[in-house]
């Protein structure tokens, strides 16, 4: 799902850029689909800032397995595209397992705005819907929830330190999964994103490097374990071990997460 520029020439340039990048990364490009929408339900601000929405269809490269291995390949394609086009386009989702539909509207307007969501052929095992107001950022289509892997209520009050820590690790990062593609995806965290988006970036990176999403969530948003007498020692040892590798992303915050196969929820220790 792509949010592209409304100006035709710029939109075509962005479109062609993605096609070239996908093919260069070994992912066959199949075509574009304009997403049917009903703009009449939107408010004035949402309508005036609405991007041009389209879906890109790509093929799974030969020799790449379904699921996470394919999504890992798409992750690289998306990061190369994002860094090439900078702020001229936003990729809401590029996955073989999930599609993100979102925007500047109320929850009860979502399925009316996106006609796809009332199509009987659209059947899913998991669906997450979330609505919130922007608190520390200006509202925009791309900052609406859900993100690619999480929806988030609250704030990440340690976000500056979290983002700086992720940046400082990049010089020594190595990935047996991404290998030579590692240089294409850094920086991991988009500094222009919201706190929710930065956490989403981090969870995505951990997952693409072989860490199950629930584990990635547990080490970034740990329980209150240090002086918790009610917690068993084995669980304390777990959190103490991972605390040497990742600082906590502290809220207060509540998170629902999904990769299309599993779904879970967590509260932070505040």
Model-derived regions, located:
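Conserved short alpha-helical segments that host acidic/polar catalytic motifs at enzyme active sites
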Residues: 1-270
């Amino acid at each position: 799902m792509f949010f592209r520029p409304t100006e035709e020439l710029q939109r075509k340039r962005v479109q062609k850029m993605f096609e070239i990048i996908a093919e260069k990364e070994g992912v066959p490009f199949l075509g574009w689909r304009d997403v049917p929408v009903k703009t009449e339900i939107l408010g004035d601000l949402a309508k005036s800032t609405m991007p041009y929405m389209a879906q890109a269809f790509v093929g799974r490269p030969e020799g790449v397995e379904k699921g996470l291995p394919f999504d890992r390949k798409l992750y690289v394609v998306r990061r190369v595209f994002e860094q090439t086009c900078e702020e001229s386009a936003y990729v809401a989702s590029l996955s073989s397992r999930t599609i993100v539909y979102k925007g500047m509207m109320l929850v009860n307007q979502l399925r009316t705005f996106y006609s796809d969501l009332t199509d009987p052929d659209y059947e899913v095992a998991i669906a997450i819907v979330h609505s919130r107001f922007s608190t520390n950022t200006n509202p925009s289509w791309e900052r609406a929830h859900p993100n690619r892997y999480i929806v988030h209520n609250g704030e990440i009050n340690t976000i500056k330190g979290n983002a700086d820590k992720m940046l400082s690790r990049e010089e020594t990062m190595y990935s047996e999964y991404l290998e030579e593609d590692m240089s294409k995806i850094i920086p991991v965290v988009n500094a222009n994103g919201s706190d929710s988006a930065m956490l989403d970036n981090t969870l995505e990176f951990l997952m693409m490097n072989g860490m199950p999403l629930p584990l990635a969530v547990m080490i970034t948003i740990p329980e209150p374990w240090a002086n918790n007498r009610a917690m068993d020692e084995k669980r304390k040892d777990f959190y103490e071990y991972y605390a040497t590798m990742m600082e906590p992303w502290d809220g207060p915050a509540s998170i629902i997460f999904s990769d299309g196969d599993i779904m879970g929820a967590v509260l932070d220790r505040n």
